[in-house]
Structure formats: structure tokens, C-alpha cells
């Protein structure tokens, strides 16, 4: 007698159909299409978990640049001055400050603008 593995097949198919349960049309009802849908969704999720980091960094930089232009400064100049002053506040925190507490953000900008950066060691000359 041939054993076709009916229970295992049903369990496996139900697993794929359950994962595709939020999909529209035949995507949540047909086993073959549901499986393809779930696999493609996993690919998109994998890709976008990485893109999310890029997107948020771009958003923070965009917000900072907008807030800094109101102060008469650009993002690139500001970041350069922060590094010269050895101020280590990341872009996420600066962006949040610019939105939620503009007065404190303005203090940081004024401090960076007014003070001269700490002099780095001069480069050794050839002789």
C-alpha cells in the first residue's frame, strides 16, 4: 500500500496559507500562490530592514539641514565644526533636539559658531 503523507502535506500547506492570511484574493487561498507571496514578502522584509537604517539617517540629516539653514549654517559646515570641537552628539539626538527643543539646539549651534575650535597639533614639516 502506498503512503502519501496526507497529514504532513496538509500541515505544511496550512502553515504557508496561515502566513499569507492577510493577503488579498487568491494570494491567501491558493497554496501555490500563497507560498510565492510569503517568499516574496520575506525578501522585501529582509531588504527593507537594511534600507530602514539608511532612510532614517537621511531623514535626520534632512531635518538638521533645515533647522541649521534657519540659523544661517549648512549641515556639512555644522558637522565639521562639531568634530573640530570634539562634540560627540549623534545625528538622531541632534534631529530630535531641533524638533522638540529648538532653544537647546540653538544653544549648541551658537556655541559651535562662536568658539574657535581646539587647535590640532601642527603637521611636521619636511626639515
From Swiss-Prot:
GO terms for molecular function: rRNA binding; structural constituent of ribosome. InterPro entries: Ribosomal_bL20 (IPR005813), RIBOSOMAL_L20_CS (IPR049946), Ribosomal_protein_bL20_C (IPR035566). It comes from Mycoplasma pneumoniae (strain ATCC 29342 / M129 / Subtype 1). It comes from the Bacteria. This is Large ribosomal subunit protein bL20. The keyword Transport does not apply. Pfam families: Ribosomal_L20 (PF00453). CDD domains: Ribosomal_L20. One of its GO terms (biological process) is ribosomal large subunit assembly. Keywords: Ribonucleoprotein, Ribosomal protein, RNA-binding, rRNA-binding. Belongs to the bacterial ribosomal protein bL20 family. GO terms for cellular component: ribonucleoprotein complex; ribosome.
